[in-house]
């Protein structure tokens, strides 16, 4: 700072002075003790503290102290403002300038690179209290940081510059535990590299097992969705038609079954003898006014047949095979009136026929009849009316009923009133026998027969329909039976059939007829096809014998 005189006026010239020149004016260059205890001595003390690397003090804090003390020194005993001219203090003017330190960062980095023995700690964790501090010596370990200060040195040097400066000295830095780097990625790589070998050595086999479990679970999930996918499933073409052996007839199949040796023959024979020992007991209970019903696993036809041949040879008896598809309650009544009572006449209704039977047994107390029924729970006799008729027959004192059931829900056919009419005694007669006769009328893929139970199904379906619907089906069946000898018969056209139904007053429009035909088609009772001329033809897919039995049954019921 200097001043010049010009025209009798003093002018002050302010010039920026670096720190080195200021120190030369305050202290001697040879490091001699300061001459006076002034503010400049405080600057020297602060400078010495900054150059001490053992304290690890942040760079910004001492620099701010030096700036403040330096300004105080320049502004001593100056109280005038800048407008007063000669009395302007240096502190007021100096505060408007930004202090520039040329090459200060490079010098600091050079000093750090030249002192590799000194360790510098870095802040790695978020919590300052858990920062890493390498054990350089006991003196640094025992030091307790004062409040408001940090022992950690957070470097502000650019990462690239520090990397260039520290690269040549890495091979020789054997005493240093940590490198002067503040990169979080490098520290994470070092920590992971140090931890990985111990983990691998402790549990070498865990990782493959976990991967195997994940792969297995993923495979199971994929297989589940593949199995339940909505893709089209192809049906196998391996059918019975591809077999070289043709379908067998009923007699051939029965002969083959008879030639097959039965398993557990001795055990089955002992069971049969056990049941045969009850024959006289059953005979006594029948005469006491009870009726016998047999249940259990296996066919009981042979057991009832043995009872008939051993005890009923000299008695009047009727055997009814209810597994036959065309059996009805009316056919049972006809067998009693015609074969047992010898009455060839016809009756107007089943009620009149039932009254005749009751009156005949009432008039002749010496008349006794044994009624043996196989499969009382068959499909043809499960209806309400059939069970009511059989219950009234079982209630006759001189008519004795012995029946068998095979369905597990057979007792549900009878309510309390029917139970009182039957007056059952239940016997468990498990025979483990084959249902050969009972299933002989079932549809089989191995026998050359078609629709043995067609009549039974047809009867059940038509019973649930209206009288007009039954009349419509009857017209179609009669027309088909009338053309049974015509080899070129393809069916009855819809228009001709509609005209016949309209003349019989069964329908009043073609929509009503089509609605009824749709119901027949759903039950597979009829089949429709179009001819070459586009006309729709109707046909019943049943054999002539079944249609004949159906028409005879309808004639008897009416």
Swiss-Prot record:
<dbReference type="InterPro" id="IPR056773">
    <property type="entry name" value="WHD_ORC2"/>
</dbReference>
<dbReference type="InterPro" id="IPR007220">
    <property type="entry name" value="ORC2"/>
</dbReference>
<dbReference type="GO" id="GO:0003682">
    <property type="term" value="F:chromatin binding"/>
</dbReference>
<feature type="compositionally biased region" description="Low complexity">
    <location>
        <begin position="169"/>
        <end position="182"/>
    </location>
</feature>
<feature type="compositionally biased region" description="Polar residues">
    <location>
        <begin position="193"/>
        <end position="202"/>
    </location>
</feature>
<dbReference type="GO" id="GO:0005664">
    <property type="term" value="C:nuclear origin of replication recognition complex"/>
</dbReference>
<keyword id="KW-0539">Nucleus</keyword>
<dbReference type="GO" id="GO:0006260">
    <property type="term" value="P:DNA replication"/>
</dbReference>
<dbReference type="Pfam" id="PF24882">
    <property type="entry name" value="WHD_ORC2"/>
</dbReference>
<keyword id="KW-0235">DNA replication</keyword>
<dbReference type="Pfam" id="PF04084">
    <property type="entry name" value="RecA-like_ORC2"/>
</dbReference>
<comment type="similarity">
    <text>Belongs to the ORC2 family.</text>
</comment>
<feature type="compositionally biased region" description="Polar residues">
    <location>
        <begin position="136"/>
        <end position="145"/>
    </location>
</feature>
<dbReference type="GO" id="GO:0003688">
    <property type="term" value="F:DNA replication origin binding"/>
</dbReference>
<comment type="function">
    <text>Component of the origin recognition complex (ORC) that binds origins of replication. DNA-binding is ATP-dependent, however specific DNA sequences that define origins of replication have not been identified so far. ORC is required to assemble the pre-replication complex necessary to initiate DNA replication.</text>
</comment>
<feature type="region of interest" description="Disordered">
    <location>
        <begin position="119"/>
        <end position="216"/>
    </location>
</feature>
<comment type="subunit">
    <text>ORC is composed of six subunits.</text>
</comment>
<protein>
    <recommendedName>
        <fullName>Origin recognition complex subunit 2</fullName>
    </recommendedName>
</protein>
<dbReference type="InterPro" id="IPR056772">
    <property type="entry name" value="RecA-like_ORC2"/>
</dbReference>
């Amino acid at each position: 700072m200097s001043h010049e005189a010009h025209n009798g006026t003093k002018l002050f010239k302010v010039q920026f002075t670096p720190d080195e020149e200021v120190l030369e004016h305050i202290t001697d260059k040879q490091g001699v003790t300061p001459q006076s205890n002034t503010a400049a001595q405080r600057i020297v003390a602060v400078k010495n503290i900054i150059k001490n690397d053992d304290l690890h003090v942040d760079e910004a804090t001492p620099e701010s102290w030096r700036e403040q003390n330096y300004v105080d020194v320049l502004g001593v005993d100056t109280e005038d403002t800048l407008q007063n001219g000669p009395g302007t203090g240096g502190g007021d003017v100096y505060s408007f300038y930004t202090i520039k330190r040329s090459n200060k960062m490079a010098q600091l980095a050079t000093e750090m690179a030249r002192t590799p023995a000194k360790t510098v700690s870095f802040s790695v964790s978020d919590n300052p209290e858990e920062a890493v501090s390498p054990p350089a010596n006991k003196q640094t370990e025992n030091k307790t940081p004062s409040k408001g200060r940090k022992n950690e040195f957070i470097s502000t040097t650019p990462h690239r510059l520090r990397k260039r400066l520290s690269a040549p000295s890495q091979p020789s830095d054997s005493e240093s535990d940590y490198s002067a780097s503040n990169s979080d990625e490098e520290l994470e790589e070092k920590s992971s590299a140090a931890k990985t070998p111990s983990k691998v050595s402790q549990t070498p086999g865990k990782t493959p097992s976990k991967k195997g479990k994940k792969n297995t679970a993923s495979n199971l999930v994929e297989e589940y969705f593949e199995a339940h996918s909505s893709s089209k499933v192809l049906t196998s073409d391996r059918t019975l038609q591809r077999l070289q052996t043709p379908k067998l007839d009923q007699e051939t199949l029965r002969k083959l079954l008879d030639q097959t040796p039965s398993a557990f023959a001795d055990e089955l024979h002992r069971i049969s003898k056990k049941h045969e020992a009850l024959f006289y007991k059953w005979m006594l209970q029948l005469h006491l006014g009870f009726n016998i019903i047999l249940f259990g696993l296996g066919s009981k036809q042979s057991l009832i047949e043995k009872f008939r041949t051993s005890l009923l040879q000299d008695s009047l008896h009727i055997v009814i095979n209810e597994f036959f598809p065309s059996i009805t309650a009316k056919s049972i009544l006809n067998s009693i009136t015609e074969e047992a009572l010898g009455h060839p006449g016809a009756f107007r209704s089943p009620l009149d026929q039932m009254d005749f039977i009751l009156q005949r047994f009432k008039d002749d107390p010496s008349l006794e009849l044994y009624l043996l029924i196989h499969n009382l729970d068959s499909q043809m006799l499960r209806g309400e009316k059939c069970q009511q008729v059989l219950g009234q027959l079982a209630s006759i004192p001189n008519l004795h009923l012995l029946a068998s059931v095979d369905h597990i829900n057979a007792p549900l056919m009878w309510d309390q009133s029917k139970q009182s009419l039957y007056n059952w005694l239940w016997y468990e007669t498990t025979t483990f026998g084959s249902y050969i006769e009972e299933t002989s009328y079932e549809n089989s893929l191995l026998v050359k027969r078609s629709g043995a139970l067609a009549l039974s199904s047809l009867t059940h379906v038509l019973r649930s329909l209206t009288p007009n619907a039954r009349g419509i089906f009857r017209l179609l069946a009669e027309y088909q039976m009338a053309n049974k000898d015509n080899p070129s018969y393809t069916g009855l056209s819809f228009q001709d059939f509609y005209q016949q139904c309209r003349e019989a007053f069964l329908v009043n429009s073609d929509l009503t007829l089509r609605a009824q035909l749709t119901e027949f088609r759903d039950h597979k009772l009829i089949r429709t096809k179009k001819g070459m001329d586009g006309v729709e033809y109707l046909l019943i897919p049943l054999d002539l014998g079944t249609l004949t039995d159906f028409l005879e049954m309808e004639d008897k019921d009416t």
